[in-house]
């Protein structure tokens, strides 16, 4: 059977690092308060000339280099983002052009922090359906540009960046020992749409708007929703937490990550944490974390890896793959 296998990975971050101490000069907060509640110590902030498209392009080129491929080898680009360069055309098309591609097709996917999980699952469907052999899946965000820098409950949380995977068609036996994507579990519940949102848009206010969040409500639902889809991914593949080599969660908040791992009895040593350095980069957080852990040798060929995320909507999901 056809499996969708990870061929390469890459990441890109803005030049500017903003520490918690710098944020102390913007809003009434402290490094101690931020670290204690979120685990975040710094984040990267896009500067002049740095956009979702430029960061996405850089991550894409890094992933292609890692895979030993060129843009000519790619059939499809899927960009997960909530901060596109323009309302339209899709920022994925902009990245396609930046890569010098005039073949194939490209589109954006918007599921906020769950975007990369949704995009990987979608790439898998295109590959297994025979519409693409190689897909460039990118998560890229410039959340700093939709933050209300007077709102200390949100502006301390988010950062900018991009990560990418090259996923290609391969052969498998149809067992959990196969390399590639083994299962995807995706969910959404729009009754929670007002708990994490941006208060503007072209069809309503005609403005970009700012991010608004009911933090306690998000936290209240996060662990349960995340553990539910992870358990369903294990059930679908006949695997367990003991079989897992790495959990690569959406890097939103260390307390949510720790709570999910504890509820699932996953060893903390198996959890990839980058929220301390990157903050919450929304759809970029999982591919950034994958790039860090694969680059430093933690994630190796044959490892069983769980990706999971929850975002505005609410949206949430998990992908279980063998690296």
Curated annotation (Swiss-Prot):
Superkingdom of origin organism: Bacteria
Catalytic reaction equation(s): malonyl-[ACP] + acetyl-CoA + H(+) = 3-oxobutanoyl-[ACP] + CO2 + CoA
Enzyme class: transferase
EC identifiers of the protein: 2.3.1.180
Function comment: Catalyzes the condensation reaction of fatty acid synthesis by the addition to an acyl acceptor of two carbons from malonyl-ACP. Catalyzes the first condensation reaction which initiates fatty acid synthesis and may therefore play a role in governing the total rate of fatty acid production. Possesses both acetoacetyl-ACP synthase and acetyl transacylase activities. Its substrate specificity determines the biosynthesis of branched-chain and/or straight-chain of fatty acids.
PANTHER family hit by this protein: 3-OXOACYL-[ACYL-CARRIER-PROTEIN] SYNTHASE 3, BETA-KETOACYL-[ACYL-CARRIER-PROTEIN] SYNTHASE III
Family: Belongs to the thiolase-like superfamily. FabH family.
UniProt protein name: Beta-ketoacyl-[acyl-carrier-protein] synthase III
């Amino acid at each position: 059977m056809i499996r969708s296998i990870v061929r390469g990975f890459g990441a890109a971050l803005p030049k500017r690092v903003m520490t918690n101490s710098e944020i102390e000069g913007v809003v009434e907060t402290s490094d101690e308060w931020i670290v204690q509640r979120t685990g975040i110590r710094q984040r990267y902030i896009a500067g002049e000339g740095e956009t979702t498209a430029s960061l996405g392009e850089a991550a894409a080129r890094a992933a292609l280099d890692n895979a030993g491929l060129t843009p000519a080898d790619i059939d499809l680009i899927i960009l997960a983002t909530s901060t596109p360069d323009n309302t339209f055309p899709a920022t994925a098309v902009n990245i396609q052009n930046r890569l010098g591609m005039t073949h194939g097709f490209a589109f954006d996917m918007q599921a906020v922090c769950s975007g990369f999980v949704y995009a990987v699952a979608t790439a898998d469907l295109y590959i297994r359906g025979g519409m693409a052999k190689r897909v460039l899946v990118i998560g890229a965000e410039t959340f700093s540009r939709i933050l209300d820098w007077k709102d200390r409950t949100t502006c301390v949380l988010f950062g900018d960046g991009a990560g990418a995977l090259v996923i290609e068609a391969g052969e498998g036996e149809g067992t959990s020992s196969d390399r590639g994507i083994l299962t995807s579990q995706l969910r959404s519940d729009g009754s929670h749409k007002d708990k994490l949102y941006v208060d503007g848009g072209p069809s309503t206010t005609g403005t970009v708007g700012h991010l608004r969040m009911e933090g306690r409500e998000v936290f209240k639902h996060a662990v349960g929703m995340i553990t539910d889809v992870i358990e369903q991914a294990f059930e679908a593949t006949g695997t367990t937490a003991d079989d897992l080599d790495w959990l690569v969660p959406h890097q939103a908040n260390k307390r949510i990550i720790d709570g999910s791992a504890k509820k699932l009895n996953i060893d903390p040593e198996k959890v990839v944490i980058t929220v301390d350095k990157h903050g919450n980069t929304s759809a970029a957080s999982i591919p950034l974390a994958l790039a860090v852990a694969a680059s430093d040798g933690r994630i190796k060929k044959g490892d069983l890896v769980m990706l999971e995320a929850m975002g505005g909507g609410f949206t949430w999901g998990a992908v279980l793959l063998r690296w």
